[in-house]
């Protein structure tokens, strides 16, 4: 069966033949290309990225404080993906950041994480690691967590920092290009070519047909929805996964000081007493700033960053509180569910992020400009719009978030203060779980799927490790 035929422009067929075509230039794609060039430099490797090269990824909002609506968004797309401007935390435990241990086994996942970490160090990552030499302090945090019915997930963290992470990925881009990797920027894959049940290549929005012996989908969180549609179109087996929906919490550094100094990122999990829903902390940014990310069609969601440089630090800590929602039949579009909640918030706030004080959140009233101005805690996201999260979230999620904040207050008092700021909506679009084997082959021969866009990983480190692993599987077949 031929699902797509060659395209033609001005009477001339535009074709290219490569050994490996990688869709997406995020951490998974980068580390896949890196490993291929290290071990098999004779291979012809092509990366296709819908965003810009890293040196051209500039967000005007950093200067103007107002989103310019760039398409594609430089925060989420381009070389290094969303990782380029993230806070750059590398989770060094297989227990955090994805499902590689389930697919490869715990020991193999541990080995790959260590190997990918060594590559980050080679390109300039900070050698210091949080959470490895504070046994007494961590025991005290664990004791408080147990008392609050919270589970502390212990995970060593290497913090790159937003600006240092950018430099590391810049070096990786230069390295790949110097090794002969071809990268097509500002290019979208529009079709996947299937002939007789085998993936043969892709077609781009520039009218080019690229044939490859191996194709890797490494589209990241930004491309998860696109890949879901392609899976349905060409018959790749998938299953509905989890969607995480919640808020970004901002407090003074003093409130989180003990956790920040000893763990940097305290990963805490709670099962709420009312609904028994799983709520977790995620992506803590000490002395960081709350930020806006933009996805397809200008959908604004909240995120957070933290910088290494002292001159860029703030006096506030922010972190995400995410409620995990697992759906059963007949519902099978969790990504759309998360998007609808974010769209509702965007509609209420004119395409910007909503902010509410925890005091108003608990009292069921909207935060006004006046109350926000006299709030003791000053927001780091300056264009956030005061509002009411109860007009956005279902009642169940509101209850889950409130109960989690009350539990966290027992571990680090001050979290449940009236002045605490809640920004919405934070959504993680890693819910399209593609069924893959240990070589990350999909049900379509010749097409492999890795990283956040395939529902395999949820963070920089496991995505990077996933890239190394799939490269080694590819080399066995070429």
Q: What are these regions, as identified by a protein language model?
A:
Residues 124-136, 140, 367:
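N-terminal leader/propeptide and maturation segments of large enzyme subunits in energy/redox metabolism
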Residues 78-131:
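Dinucleotide-binding Rossmann-like beta1-alpha1 core, especially the glycine-rich loop
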Residues 108-111, 115-119, 136, 140, ...:
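A non-catalytic, amphipathic alpha-helix used as a structural packing/dimerization or gating element
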Residues 2-6, 11-97, 138-478:
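Residues forming the flavin
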